[in-house]
Amino acid sequence: MAIVKVKPTSPGRRAMVKVVNKDLHKGKPYAPLLDTQSSTAGRNNNGHITTRHKGGGHKHHYRIVDFRRTKDGIPAKVERLEYDPNRSANIALVVYADGERRYIIAPKGVTVGQQLMSGSEAPIRAGNTLPIRNIPVGTTIHCIEMLPGKGAQMARSAGTSAMLLAREGTYAQVRLRSGEIRRVHIECRATIGEVGNEEHSLRQIGKAGANRWRGIRPTVRGVAMNPVDHPHGGGEGKTAAGRDPVSPWGTPTKGYRTRSNKRTTSMIVQRRHKR
């Protein structure tokens, strides 16, 4: 991968920094693993905005990614690496010995032609997926399941990883990039190594229109609105909010915790927040 600073031929390109990977496939994606994807623009089934700053953007297909990696004992060869518009990480198209093709999250260091395995007998090598009970303590892992068989849910973004800290009985402790230490069942699966495309965070969008292509709409400050639109709105000229920061619905923001899932609180050994 290379970090390319674009020539300043316009104000938008002057600040642009791109991450170029010449190893990515330049053709069309593998059609049998594509699915249609409709845009909701941040609305729920009632038409109410549940996620702000979403809407528009370029249409794209969803790539069906295998987060379970359940074809145990069958070797798979990396056929090509591809760009995925739905996530920050790149994806890899792998072809198994029985001829089946699947997309997986592309791990760091995995190249075209490399052989990957999954299952309890797989070697400890980047890109291989094993149950946590078979992974040595201290190993860097990614694409971690939270429930056995549900599929990977943690450490899937570009450049992310976690570390297996300990195993106690039927549970293991995993430290995430955020600093949170979480308990995970030892039958949950994880992939060895880090997620690739680690230079994703170094890119610079360059102009507002590039975010509009991605379906991200502008973020308007509450103090710039009218009182009918936001608790911070109103006033003559430029004024302060006049109260502690809140969301448009009056919920405290900037550090206020909104987690309410008490059912899984026992799985968190150490929170990511500093007390």
Curated annotation (Swiss-Prot):
Polar residues biased stretches = 35-46
What Pfam families does UniProt report for this protein, alphabetically?
Ribosomal_L2, Ribosomal_L2_C
Name a GO molecular-function annotation. Answer: transferase activity
Instruction: Please verify whether the record's keywords include Transit peptide.
Output: no
- From the UniProt record, give one GO term of the biological process aspect: cytoplasmic translation
Cysteine-cysteine disulfides: none
An annotated GO cellular component of this protein is: large ribosomal subunit
User: Which InterPro entries does the UniProt entry name for this protein?
Assistant: NA-bd_OB-fold (IPR012340), Rib_uL2_dom2 (IPR014722), Ribosomal_uL2 (IPR002171), Ribosomal_uL2_bac/org-type (IPR005880), Ribosomal_uL2_C (IPR022669), Ribosomal_uL2_CS (IPR022671), Ribosomal_uL2_dom3 (IPR014726), Ribosomal_uL2_RNA-bd_dom (IPR022666)
Keywords recorded for this protein, A-Z: Ribonucleoprotein, Ribosomal protein, RNA-binding, rRNA-binding
Task: List the biased-composition ranges (Basic residues).
Answer: 50-59
Similarity field: Belongs to the universal ribosomal protein uL2 family.
Described purpose of this protein according to its UniProt entry: One of the primary rRNA binding proteins. Required for association of the 30S and 50S subunits to form the 70S ribosome, for tRNA binding and peptide bond formation. It has been suggested to have peptidyltransferase activity; this is somewhat controversial. Makes several contacts with the 16S rRNA in the 70S ribosome.
Summarize subunit and interaction data from the UniProt record for this chain: Part of the 50S ribosomal subunit. Forms a bridge to the 30S subunit in the 70S ribosome.
Q: Know the name of this protein?
A: Large ribosomal subunit protein uL2
What species is this protein from? Paraburkholderia phymatum (strain DSM 17167 / CIP 108236 / LMG 21445 / STM815)
Instruction: Identify the taxonomic lineage of the organism of origin.
Output: Bacteria, Pseudomonadati, Pseudomonadota, Betaproteobacteria, Burkholderiales
Gene behind this protein: rplB
